[in-house]
């Protein structure tokens, strides 16, 4: 269904790109498991449930890319994922971060696979953190995503809305200008 809708949009409208924000499994809610046990068992998959979930997401990303490129090869396809693919402690390719949730492990989105396979033309990681954040440092993630783009475009997503928060780092009027300087280096 989703692939057909996107193909229809690309065919009928003069769009430059299809941009998907947060396309993967829902963010975890406490200890409540995602209710897909029946679908997993019915699938008969020999994959672990985590790998099966990633495979489901991978399949639709690949199919969307194929539909877009078949219809109008010049239309771009991009994703705006959560800021952390995986933590370094869990994977040697991961970022130097201490995120409680990651794309790969909790949202079942293997962004690096999509970039490497060319299924997406660009990535817009949601780097809604502050510079020197002790858990997920903005500047480290800018460098990490740039180094793991596989030749695809990287457009950093800024958390401008955070300027209104009470967090002391976001009260600094130079936080966003300094982030922009980091991205431009």
Place the predicted regions along the sequence by residue.
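Polysaccharide-binding and catalytic clefts of secreted carbohydrate-active enzymes
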Residues: 1-119
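Active-site-adjacent beta->alpha loops and helix N-cap segments on the catalytic face
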Residues: 133-142
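Hydrophobic, Leu/Ile/Phe/Ala-enriched alpha-helical segments that form helix-helix packing faces
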Residues: 64-68, 145, 149, 183
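Active-site clefts of carbohydrate-active enzymes
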Residues: 74-99, 141-179
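Substrate-binding cleft of secreted/luminal carbohydrate-active enzymes
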Residues: 108-134, 148-185
